Amino acid sequence: MNTKSKITILGISFLFLAFSGEVNAQMTKEKTVMVGGAAMYPSKNIIENAVNSKDHKTLVAAVKAAGLVETLQGSGPFTVLAPTDAAFAKLPKGTVETLVKPENKEMLTQILTYHVLPGKLSAKEIWAAVKAGNGKSMMKTVEGEELTFWTKGKDLYVKDAKGNSAKVTIADVNQSNGVIHVIDTVLMP
């Protein structure tokens, strides 16, 4: 290998290292929120972040089974109310296993899209809507039905069509295509 080739390779290697260092520096500058033991990066989309959360394995599997991965990787924006694995564990035994079967894809999709609001709504915006609504705010989901948001003390809650309430346990997990609010109960249309 001649000297010119070595210099070119060395130059390319230096540029690559400089670029990857710049990317790493950019990632560390982002304001992240820890969810399920993993940092959630605002520069990543909902799916890219969710797959790293140890607390959302069931949700990720359900999203895959429903064929919603591509949708939630799209530009959105979306507000996702993300139930934890513990929330799914509260469902009657065998419910999750039944829902992820191919023949139940339509029902699973309905349940999952009931956890998604169009647009990017911060907890502050939802809180303001609740205040403006004299203690509650109805919001239409992507599925088509409404959820009722309400507050108690410093906590934000959401009630489903069946009257079950979920507490927002981690709010404002910003994503490149929306925001996630972690909840402790699965909502049912």
Regions found by a protein language model. Name each.
Residues 24-189:
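Mature, structured domains of secreted/extracytosolic soluble proteins
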